[in-house]
């Protein structure tokens, strides 16, 4: 199949505090070559899930939920260290938002944050976390200002107004779709069908 000349951009809303978002990030990462062949580019948008749901910063992740997340990760073949509590991810997400105009830097930052939390079992709230993450990502970033944190609030409010009620959520033709985490082939089929509809491809009979 010939790769489309113009990429189809798909917004994905996420929160670094969400283990489900981490698993989705890893599944979509494995699908990178297939998505590129389909001409699909993912745009990752950080939002503060605690501002629009019942989750509260500092709230413990109970043992039953932790076991369920770890079982899901095993089914997907992804190693994960589930955080013990819902951490304050706003500063890390504010840095991601500040890097919007430098996509390669934003991608490196996002990957470094995911790895810090879900591979190294580190807390985003521990002293010096952002500085060490930046060092690992080979980036120079300043601590987020009050304005940068307010930008996350603004983006979260805008996403909520657009119908986003959780993460991860894909925005397809202005319609928010929260499909949760799926196996690779299911996720790929979901995005393949959307791309076909968007481009007017009737697909196989």
Question: What are these model-predicted stretches?
Answer:
Residues 3, 8-14, 20-38, 108, ...:
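C-terminal cap of thioredoxin/glutaredoxin-like
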Residues 16, 20-117, 202:
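Structural alpha/beta surface segment adjacent to cysteine/selenocysteine redox centers
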